[in-house]
Swiss-Prot record:
UniProt main location, coarse: cytoplasm
SUPFAM superfamilies: YacF-like (SSF160950)
Disulfide links within the chain: none
Gene that specifies this protein: zapD
Protein name: Cell division protein ZapD
Cell location: Cytoplasm
Organism, as annotated: Escherichia coli O17:K52:H18 (strain UMN026 / ExPEC)
UniProt record, GO biological process: division septum assembly; FtsZ-dependent cytokinesis
GO cellular component, one term: cell division site
Keywords: Cell cycle, Cell division, Cytoplasm, Septation
């Protein structure tokens, strides 16, 4: 069986921001528990980048709008024959609950911004080698605390993002499930189509081809060019089958 690689590409700025936030939150938990300097720097660097993303836009406002939009979409299915009504109603209630929690939560990321250790590490991350023990003795001593004490603090930091994480997970799940994958074929490594007001492109490509997509465009129209991973010797077939979902 062929191994399929999933590529996702945002077609607007809000989706680009959401995918970056999702990626960074996932990265926070990859190397847990934090047991050494490398794991700590990975964690704090992702926290810092996450706070940078939060400062660039109205993340909460856009998410609340999307939660409301998804509720309205689901309400159009109420009463439609053959549709699982209990599932629809449960999703609507979950969206409402996520919105209520998000709107009543403190400013997104504020708890992390106000943490002294996070602030000290953030100041040094842009300096090459700036997180040595003599630059950050506070981080050095923190790494020598009992593991359980560090774990508890990390859990508290991550938990402060729960209102955002829960709302974002629901929104992205619904968007990803909003359109099925359909087989498409590129000619000479190129494919273009209308986006149909989509927010996100999802593309499944066989690993055997050792190709990757370069995607450009916006919600009304997009283009995909397939490129060989080996830029010198790799080849792009005249016809290439792949699966595409416009969500």
């Amino acid at each position: 069986m062929q191994t399929q690689v999933l590529f996702e590409h945002p077609l607007n700025e809000k989706m680009r921001t959401w995918l970056r936030i999702e990626f960074l939150i996932q990265q926070l938990t990859v190397n847990l528990p934090i047991a050494d300097h490398a794991g700590a720097l990975h964690f704090f660097r992702n926290v810092s980048e996450l706070l940078d993303v939060f400062e660039r836009g109205e993340v909460r406002t856009e998410l609340l709008k999307e939660l409301d939009r998804q509720q309205r979409k689901l309400q159009t299915w109420i009463g439609v024959p053959g549709v699982d009504q209990s599932r629809i109603e449960a999703l609507i209630q979950q969206l409402k609950a996520a919105g209520s929690v998000l709107i009543s939560a403190p400013r997104i990321g504020q708890f992390l911004r106000e943490d002294r250790l996070i602030a000290l590490v953030r100041q040094r991350l842009s300096i090459p080698g700036g997180c040595c023990s003599f630059d950050l003795p506070s981080l050095h001593i923190w790494l020598h605390l009992p593991q359980a004490q560090r774990d508890s603090q990390v859990e508290t930091w991550i938990a402060s993002l729960n209102p955002l994480t829960q709302a974002l997970t629901m929104v992205l799940d619904l968007i990803r499930q909003s359109a099925p994958f359909r087989k498409q074929t590129s000619l000479n490594g190129f494919y273009q189509d209308n986006g149909g007001d989509a927010d996100l492109l999802r593309l499944n490509l066989s690993l055997d081809s050792q190709l990757y997509p370069q995607i450009s465009g916006h919600k009304s129209r997009f283009a995909i060019r397939f490129m060989p991973l080996d830029s010198e010797n790799g080849q792009v077939p005249e016809r290439l089958d792949f699966e595409l979902a416009c969500c």
